[in-house]
Amino acid sequence: MLVKVFGSAIHGVSAQTITIEVNVDQGVGYHLVGLPDNAIKESSHRISAALKNVGHKLPGKKITINMAPADLRKEGSAYDLSIAIGILAASDKILAENLDQYIIMGELSLDGGLQPIKGVLPIAIKAREEGFKGIILPKQNTQEAAIVNNLDVYGVENIKEVIDFFNGERDLEKTEIDTRKEFQNKINEFPYDFSEVKGQETAKRAMEVAAAGGHNIILVGPPGSGKTMLAKRVPSILPPLTMKEALETTKIHSVAGKMGSNTSLMTVRPFRSPHHTISDVALVGGGAYPQPGEISLAHNGVLFLDELPEFKRAVLEVMRQPLEDREVTISRAKFSVNYPSSFMLVASMNPSPSGYFPDDPNNTSSQTEMQRYMNKLSGPLLDRIDIHIEVQKVEFEQLAEKRKGESSIEIRNRVLKAREIQAKRYKDLDINYNAQMGPKEIEKYCDLDSTCQQLIKNAMEKLNLSARAYDRILKVARTIADLDDAENISPAHISEAIQYRSLDRDFWRA
């Protein structure tokens, strides 16, 4: 008897429906075709043990399983449940009449229990798009799938529940959540606040400008000056995630298996801080079966690279293209996948190998060591970082000050006003904030008077800045003007923007 069951495969951050055809006929053997990986090929052992432990067994006949489309690689153990149900239906142990209404996914344990799977949100979205009535999943994944409206989501703990459901002997409980309520309740929850930062007013201002325009920023300062403390508080001043951004972000983390059990929707911007020993594949994504890297996990949020020169230069260089294009393409011989990577880069570094230049009384870093240290960061990479700011060590008087600094909410309100101005400006364009401006937008929205032009010309000549750095100055100046609610860029805005570029040559060529 031939039976069709439906599952789903992940491709990038999207899903594709898989038709699992199971035929049980006279003969012996277990044949699995349709480009499955080793984990799927091993499923026969898990399925056999699981069925035996819930009172069923594999039929003593020839079992042929085809996973279509045959040219799409299928991977992982998430097809265990759908294959097992198909085998039982083809053996007349399950009524097959309603199988075509559901996507069925789940990894089987040997006792018949179900383990959580990855990529549930894109699977649920695809199921709704293709008109399926519902989706049957491990119970740990149901909160995530229930984000999708107009789709019945059933969570099960073992395969026996699924067998009884299709035989009409049990009703499964639907999982329902109020997505909007869930989103609004957690949208302003942050573990860190800028009011906890003592001193560092200049650095705080630079962080505000960076957040307002979506600019990348690098903090240069000695150990203990508060670089990491400042970076961890950036998400608290960024605009709240929109529902569209929350769904995008959740899909990426779902595909990567980074969603916790019983987690539904990511409601705050991600903050990713990989160690400096990370490989280029782990950073940008890839592998034999491509997975999102850290830059995609930071999509719509912050990627913090602490001690930037300690990262391998090759690792940093592969980040150049995603920084510019805000997406990363991973190509293989037979396919390619795109992962979004629109993130705000926050990097930090010491000014020298010793960490204390130019205030090191013993001058423990030689000129050669300094040059080698700075050469780890290429000019093209630095040009893609809009704001370079020096973070000074905090004096005792500032640390002892009991009065709290400005809160994240106050800073965020100014950032939101600037973002609203940008949203109106770019409402007819495919960009959202100033950092995304291209040459045409810069020419149109960053018009300078003669005083501003002379000011920036002098800075370019004195600091030997590149054409890309010139564009960065204009973008940052536009953001500063937006924070001031000014229609035109003034010399004061240009001066402040230049101040955020001056470190790149003073320090890099120390």
Regions found by a protein language model. Name each.
Residues 33, 39-44, 59, 66-76, ...:
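Basic, amphipathic alpha-helical bundle interface domains used for macromolecular binding and assembly
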Residues 170-209, 213, 240-295:
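P-loop NTPase nucleotide-binding/switch module
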Residues 221, 285, 307:
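The Walker A (P-loop) glycine that initiates the GxxxxGKT/S ATP-binding motif of P-loop NTPases
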Residues 219-260, 325:
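Walker A/P-loop
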Residues 1-218, 222-228, 266, 331, ...:
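Peripheral, non-AAA+ core regions of ATP-driven protein-machinery
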Residues 18-24, 283, 386-389:
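Short beta-strand elements
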